[in-house]
Amino acid sequence: MKHVRSFQLITSALVIFGLSGAVGGCDNVQSAPEGDAQSQAAQSTEALAGVLKDRSAEEDSLRLAGELDRVIRRVEKRYGVEAGVAIDAQSGSVQRGLKGEEPTWSTIKVPIAIAAAEVGADEQMIDLAIEQSDNDAAYALWTQVQWETGDANGAVSDLLDEYDAPAKVEDSFGYSTWTLKNQAAFGASLPCVAHARHVYDAMANLIVYHDNGLSALPDTRAKGGWGLSEIDGMYAHRQFGVRTTKGAEPQSVGLAIEVVMPGDDFSDAEPALNALAKGVDKLVEQAIADGAIKPYVACRRI
């Protein structure tokens, strides 16, 4: 049907263009110079191509959103959770379900570790904070950023702002807020973020206990965070990272997912997180093959 509508649009545009030319010929004794006519035709063709391209991109985005909705509904129904997903690619960003308004928990350790690497943090401390999600190591990195810059909160916020992925960073950093959409945007940027190389490598080497959801997928680096809300008693488990594709030029797509459920057990949320991650990965792989998702070349650059 998309090709039929495109053909109809092209036909209508050409008919209108032809009629306009015919009317112009009747009203004027002298026709337009041949060069002007060719130029006008070229401009009309370019404008029409732009309209068709925009319409195709919009249709791809709507179709992707609908498919994400179906993935989310299946996971929610089967596991009794609420879920959210964000995808960031060259072709655009899509966010469905939960927006990620809950605390960031340990996902915020990624930009903290990058900010710490920028001021010379010990790589073993970074490994502990990312690979094992060690809270004491993360606090040591935060303290070093505070000592070196005088404002750890501002340093981490500035880093995220630089890559158009802002968060509300709190001194009790686990309670920061960072939407899934912005996490996916930062994830897509990770391969090119200054001073992020060691952090990026650590995200591919998580301990077995944390190697689930996005982290368990092939060609994907991610960091998770989880915790119990003191406000509504709901347990949130969220992850963000980057999915890369191999080829002549590496390509990347930023991903962020979240499940929220009653209870307080990490293991209870894990099956839902795994199912959500696999569903999203399958969808993204197919959308890339179909051209509905166009990854960033190497990484997302601002």
Predicted features and spans:
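Glycine/charged-rich beta-loop-alpha catalytic/anionic-binding loops adjacent to active sites
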Residues: Q90-K99, D122, A165-P166
